[in-house]
C-alpha cells in the first residue's frame, strides 16, 4: 500500500494558502483567529 501523504508544494499552497483562505468568509475567520493567537505563520 502506498503512503497517503505525497507532498507537493503547489497543491499545498493552492489548497491551504493565504489567497485561498482569504477567498471565503470561513477562511478569513481562520486567518483572524491565527493573528489573534499570534501565530508566526498564518497559512501554508
UniProtKB/Swiss-Prot annotation:
PROSITE patterns: RIBOSOMAL_L34. GO terms for molecular function: structural constituent of ribosome. It comes from the Bacteria. InterPro entries: Ribosomal_bL34, Ribosomal_bL34_CS. GO terms for cellular component: ribonucleoprotein complex; ribosome. Pfam families: Ribosomal_L34. Keywords: Ribonucleoprotein, Ribosomal protein. Signal peptide: none annotated. GO terms for biological process: translation. Belongs to the bacterial ribosomal protein bL34 family. This is Large ribosomal subunit protein bL34. It comes from Desulfatibacillum aliphaticivorans. The lineage of its organism: Bacteria, Pseudomonadati, Thermodesulfobacteriota, Desulfobacteria, Desulfobacterales. The gene is rpmH.
Amino acid at each position: 500500500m502506498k503512503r497517503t501523504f505525497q507532498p507537493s508544494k503547489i497543491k499545498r499552497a493552492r489548497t491551504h494558502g493565504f489567497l485561498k483562505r482569504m477567498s471565503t468568509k470561513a477562511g478569513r475567520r481562520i486567518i483572524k483567529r491565527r493573528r489573534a493567537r499570534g501565530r508566526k505563520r498564518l497559512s501554508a
